[in-house]
């Protein structure tokens, strides 16, 4: 496991910001950070990007788009949900993870030798923590903003 540094925090913050973009824009920018591929996963209001290079796979969950009612509703759906992986969690965040979960897991399982990092901002930060709890020992590090 790596230690957190300012540079790593900035690196994963950039990737978290790319999760708000379309796949073409994110692909162009992620190459500047050393990633060869960006894949958009979207289902309703839930969205994330999968970035890969030779060593790593990064799942970056998109945060709240304040102009999108579904995102705002996910944020305010703050009652507790019992998760077998993470105890009690924010119900709105949990529902958003469920929307993209199968495709995220398929991408991760397709890269079994790569180190897995998870990141996200706002709603995406909450989704990141739930995903990390579900994936447990497979995760190298989680960065939330």
What are the functions of these language-model segments?
Residues 1-119, 123-145:
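Non-catalytic, mobile gating and regulatory segments of ester bond hydrolases
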